[in-house]
Amino acid sequence: MGKEIISSKDLHLYYGKKEALKGIDLTFNQGELTAMIGPSGCGKSTYLRCLNRMNDLIPDVTITGSVVYKGKDIYGPKTDNVELRKEIGMVFQQPNPFPFSVYENVIYGLRLKGVKDKQVLDEAVETSLKAAAVWEDVKDKLHKSALSLSGGQQQRVCIARVLAVEPDIILLDEPTSALDPVSSGKIENMLLTLKEKYTMIMVTHNMSQASRISDKTAFFLQGDLIEFNDTKKVFLNPKEKQTEDYISGKFG
């Protein structure tokens, strides 16, 4: 078992008076890819956004409980959210490159950190794009707009942008749902490679994707964590009937 890297304890989230997360206790280990599954509106994306305080940007949200990362509660008063999001990066459902060149997209976070050395920036661009399995596609287009790329290429550039600041954890909110099967397959293969270096937590509606590439799976339903275990156990021998019914397609 890997070393614990981030965990939530008794995490509740309310949109106004509506309780969207009902006391979630969950621990993630270093170097593992965890899939979070469940029907739409079950709380999995809401939970994911709690792990780097993205929900702070939503009006009328109340959060109680704790999320402990590197021994500190990220909801404590001394947390710098900008620094936190460099260490716990996020990739969204829709590719969201900035309206800049591919090169400027990748080094965006490094520029924020004050990095100016061209050699350092050049190396970071190549290393990150290679890690995101898109270097060969874009190496001759580095100074063209990232918006001119295909959807799959844009998503991989967004992943490279996260990798460039060398995070500990990468959060992925349905990163392949807007892409065609070929692009999705490329991203899945890339995630399997990245798992050797990063901890990843991924929301997905794709059951076969979760079973193929994740080490652990968490099943959410109506704001509750129903089951969390090794992926093989969740899919082949779930402990809870609700998990079995969801995986077998009886609801969702």
UniProtKB/Swiss-Prot annotation:
Annotated EC: 7.3.2.1
Membrane topology, as annotated: Peripheral membrane protein
GO cellular component annotations of the record: plasma membrane
Catalytic activity annotation: phosphate(out) + ATP + H2O = ADP + 2 phosphate(in) + H(+)
GO MF, any single term: ATP binding
One GO biological process term: phosphate ion transmembrane transport
All copies of domain ABC transporter, residue ranges: 6-247
Similarity comment text for this entry: Belongs to the ABC transporter superfamily. Phosphate importer (TC 3.A.1.7) family.
Function of the protein: Part of the ABC transporter complex PstSACB involved in phosphate import. Responsible for energy coupling to the transport system.
Protein known as: Phosphate import ATP-binding protein PstB 1
Species, as recorded: Enterococcus faecalis (strain ATCC 700802 / V583)
Upper taxonomic lineage: Bacteria, Bacillati, Bacillota, Bacilli, Lactobacillales
